Amino acid sequence: MTLVFDVGKTNKKGIIFDAQYRVVWETSITIPETADEDGHACEDLAALCDWLRSTFHAVMSDARFQIDAVNCTAYGASFVHLDQDGRALTPLYNYLKPYPDALHRQFFDTWGSEQSLALQTASPVMDSLNSGLQLYRLKYEQPQVFEKIKWSLHLPQYVAWLLQTFLQKENKPLPVSEITSIGCHTLLWDFSRQDYHRWVYEEEIERKLPPVSHQRGRGLHDSSAALIPYLATVQEPFLLLSTGTWCISMNPFNTEPLTAAELEQDCLCYLTYEGKPVKSARYFGGHEHEKAVQQMAREHQAPADFYKKASLVPQSSAEADYLRFMTQLIEKQAISTQLAIGQSGVRTIFVDGGFSKNEVYMRLLSAAFPHMNVFAAEVAQATALGAALAVHVAGPIPPDLIAFKPY
């Protein structure tokens, strides 16, 4: 059995898979946010650690489960900064926290234009969403704190390290860095050199980053983890549209280099856990959808989940508004997805995550790509399953892990 912790921005899950990768147990929690020293909302790191610890020990002491492997996945663009005793020195800053204009200008005046750094690191410039800029900010805004940092860990690697400390109480394990986290829009990784960018060394940021480990089970960035079940079981080329807060079109079969124009439209490269680039395009669609349906529900005095009954033939004024909104959302989504398709010749789109269960979304998306095969993909806990498959040791991987519904 494999135990996986899937730490999402909203939901935190603990999941156990059996040898056939069926979910045999799961639990989830939503942890209320707290605030950092500036009053900005952020993850409650102490509450997260408490939940991880109690859930881990409950599973390990449960006679029903024989856990052979443990892994985790979490959202990216977030650092936990540890002192020499392994204590967190700062809040877990939110990647949506505004970035100071003066510091932004200072960085690019020193290290080169936004366009050149974006091309070298396959990262659109997004301020706090570029986790490397969070480290730069800490160095210049809180130099005393920066000096005390022994290790800065991306959240997936912090969770993995924490899980190891639960197992090894006597000797604390050494933390590591991991390629899926380093390679996801961080401005840290030079894709052509396959090494940290020059600025990371010259600012002495790399001294705060643990050695890169290619050992499995050291945590995965959630977007890279979600791709693994498809790469493991699907034979023909495909694009995966992974939907959640972000809707990310990921094309492992597009080998064209990123262009400046694509970067300006929020294209980027992720890295698989094997270190291969995955050309992708992001759209904040889930976030836009959440805000819009809340507003529509208020305006029409409709239930919060009114949109779940919506179809292409509206039955109410709220549903008519929803259809108009979704038509606009799909127009933006189609532009984003087409950027990831590029000249790759991919003819199949798989949609997973929340929107894969939304009939309006799926039918409008299929209409936007009439010459493509569009499928809603049903896979139990895709991101967590990817993390479990990443520590797969022996034996064949079942071919029926994913159910596909054509549109």
Show the residue positions of the predicted features.
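Nucleotide/phosphate-binding loop and acidic/charged catalytic motifs
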Residues: V70, K97, P173-G183
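Non-globular, low-complexity intrinsically disordered regions
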Residues: P210-H214
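Short, basic and Ser/Thr-rich N-terminal targeting/leader segments
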Residues: K9-N11, D68, T73-Y75, L129-S131, ...
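Conserved beta-strand and immediately adjacent loop positions that scaffold enzyme active sites
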Residues: M1, K13, S78, E178, ...
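Glycine-rich phosphate-binding loop of ATP-grasp-fold ATP-dependent ligases
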Residues: T90, V125, T180-W189
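Active-site phosphate-binding/coordination module
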Residues: V59-N130
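N-terminal glycine/serine-rich phosphate-binding loop of ATP-dependent small-molecule kinases
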Residues: M1-P91, R347-T348, R363-N373, L401
